[in-house]
Swiss-Prot record:
Pfam families, A to Z: ZapB
Family assignment from sequence similarity: Belongs to the ZapB family.
Name listed for the protein in its UniProt record: Cell division protein ZapB
Subcellular location(s) of the protein: Cytoplasm
GO cellular component, one term: cytoplasm
InterPro entries: Cell_div_ZapB
Length: 73
């Protein structure tokens, strides 16, 4: 009986260790995905800032041109 219990315990421990290893691998994959998403987020934030600056520049140019048209009318 004692050997049977030890065998069952060993089986459960082995299954638990395998589960832990799988979870570690999944965690590593999620960390890599998170890192890639953070990098993509940073790039998109920089692109957004650049586009906002370009939009502001164009708005200034259009405002200047409208001002010139109004002064000539």
């Amino acid at each position: 009986m004692s050997l049977e219990l030890l065998s069952k315990l060993e089986t459960k421990i082995q299954a638990t260790l395998e589960t832990i290893e799988l979870l570690k691998m999944e965690l590593e994959e999620e960390k890599q995905k998170t890192s890639a998403l953070n990098e993509q987020n940073q790039q998109l934030s920089e692109q957004n800032q650049q586009l906002q600056q370009e939009l502001a520049s164009w708005n200034d140019k259009v405002t200047g041109l409208v001002g010139l048209l109004n002064s000539e009318i």
